[in-house]
Each structure stands twice: as structure tokens, then as C-alpha cells.
């Protein structure tokens, strides 16, 4: 038996991504596809919490193709303005990105990403940019294989989690790979930490965790068996576990 279920590596990656420019349009495979086509690797399920963004910001989530045939045609013919779907976002939004979801972060957006511990990414489009004088590698065939058609609706792709009850573990998303919570601390709260671990990222404000001062930008892990967690102050925390 291993600490992290069926693997000896930590099951999640937590990243802060500060996109200065528009990032490439990409998609990730699921576990089954990655196992066959990527030497037994895991696929990638991830989610984004918008830490900050420009006014009237958008993000690429999903696409506008109705069938696999239309998807293939749009990609092979470079009909990117028809294919790519952008939706509006604001600070405090949460987006779940399942395998098969076309996605990309736009410039001027700061996000907290929680993901499966995998690095399998298929690049669909990179705005014809050059790297060392050459176009960056694209993964067209594999992308077409794994992209979900039709895409999840825009309305179901993003939700605002800015105004949730204070001093409680607010569940943002649960899947077989991770559980994501948002905690808005105002004054004092306690909870029992019985999960295998809990990653904690302070996304705003400052406070005290069991006597230890923390502030915006701090990351820490509450291990299994930590027991009673006492949070004090005025702060927001995004927490993740499995």
C-alpha cells in the first residue's frame, strides 16, 4: 500500500501561472488514452481559480465545432476564429477543465492551477509563433483524437465563487482525482483535518494557522492526522486533497 493510493509520487501539482502573453491552445488526454499512447502515463484533469485578470478579460474554454468532422476541418484549415471559444472571466471565478477540453490562458491573467501530477499536453495552436526561428511543435492528430465534441456549454464551464459563506469548507469541485475547497476566514474557524493531506494556498489577506502566521501567496500542507485546524484572521484559502 502506498501513501498516495496507487502511486508513489505526490498525486497533485499546484501551480501559480502568470500569463504575460496569450498561451498556446491545448488539450489533455484522459488516463485511458495516455496509457496507450503515452507509454503508460496518466492523463490530466485540472482546474483553475482566477486570482487576478484584466478588466473585460476572457479565457479560452471549449470550441465551436458540432461534430468530429467539423472539428477536424476547422483545425486542418486553420479556421481558428471560428473554432476557438472565448468566455468572459473575472477575479474569483473557478473553472474545471476535464480531459478533452480545449483551453488556454489569455495574457494578463493570474491563476492558481490544481492538476493531476501529469505533464501530457497536446498543443492545438500557438498563434503561428516561432521558437528559435521555428514553429513550435503541434500535436494535431492526437488533439483531434481526444477533444470532446460537442464542448461543454460556456455557462457550465465557469462559475463565480467570490461570495460564499464564511468560516466553512466550501466545496468547489469533487472528482476522482481531487477535492477542491474555498475557505473565507473572517475572525476564527476550526475544522478537523482527516484527509490524506490538504494543500493550502492563501489567495488573499493574512491570518494565523495553529499559531503560525500566514499571508497572501503562502502555500503549506496539512498532513494526514494533523487533527484540529484553527484559522484566525481575514483571508481566503484554496485547499485541495484527494
Question: Where would I find each of the regions flagged by the language model?
Answer:
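Loop-centered beta-sheet repeat module
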Residues: 75-120
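Conserved short histidine dyad/triad with adjacent acidic residue
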Residues: 23, 27-36, 50-56, 176-194, ...
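Short, conserved beta-strand element in jelly-roll/cupin
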Residues: 15-19, 42-55, 63-64, 175, ...
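C-terminal amphipathic alpha-helical segment
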Residues: 122-188, 194
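Ligand-binding loop in jelly-roll beta-barrel domains
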Residues: 9, 17-22, 53-56, 101-121, ...
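Short acidic-glycine-tyrosine-enriched beta hairpin
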Residues: 83-96, 110, 208-228
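Short, small-residue-biased leader/transition segments that mark boundaries at the very start
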Residues: 1-3
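Short, structured beta-strand/loop micro-motifs enriched in basic residues and often containing a Trp
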Residues: 73-81, 203-208
Amino acid at each position: 500500500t502506498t501513501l498516495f493510493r496507487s502511486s508513489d509520487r505526490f498525486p497533485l501539482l499546484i501551480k501559480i501561472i502568470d500569463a504575460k502573453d496569450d498561451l498556446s491552445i491545448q488539450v489533455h488526454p484522459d488516463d485511458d488514452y495516455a496509457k496507450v499512447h503515452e507509454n503508460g502515463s496518466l492523463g490530466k484533469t485540472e482546474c483553475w481559480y482566477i486570482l487576478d485578470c484584466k478588466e473585460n478579460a476572457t479565457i479560452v474554454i471549449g470550441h465551436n465545432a458540432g461534430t468530429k468532422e467539423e472539428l477536424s476541418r476547422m483545425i486542418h484549415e486553420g479556421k481558428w476564429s471560428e473554432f476557438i471559444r472565448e468566455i468572459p472571466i473575472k477575479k474569483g471565478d473557478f473553472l474545471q477543465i476535464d480531459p478533452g477540453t480545449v483551453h488556454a490562458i489569455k495574457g494578463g491573467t493570474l491563476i492558481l492551477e490544481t492538476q493531476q501530477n501529469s505533464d501530457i499536453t497536446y498543443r492545438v495552436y500557438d498563434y503561428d509563433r516561432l521558437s528559435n526561428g521555428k514553429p513550435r511543435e503541434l500535436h494535431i492528430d492526437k488533439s483531434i483524437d481526444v477533444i470532446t465534441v460537442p464542448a461543454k456549454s460556456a455557462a457550465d464551464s465557469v462559475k463565480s465563487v467570490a461570495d460564499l459563506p464564511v468560516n466553512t469548507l466550501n466545496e468547489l469541485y469533487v472528482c476522482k482525482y481531487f477535492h477542491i475547497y474555498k475557505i473565507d476566514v473572517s475572525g476564527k474557524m476550526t475544522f478537523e483535518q482527516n484527509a490524506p493531506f490538504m494543500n493550502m494556498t492563501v489567495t488573499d489577506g493574512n491570518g494565523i494557522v495553529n499559531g503560525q502566521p500566514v499571508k497572501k501567496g503562502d502555500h503549506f500542507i496539512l498532513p494526514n492526522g494533523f487533527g484540529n485546524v484553527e484559522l484566525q484572521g481575514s483571508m481566503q484559502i484554496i485547499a485541495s486533497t484527494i
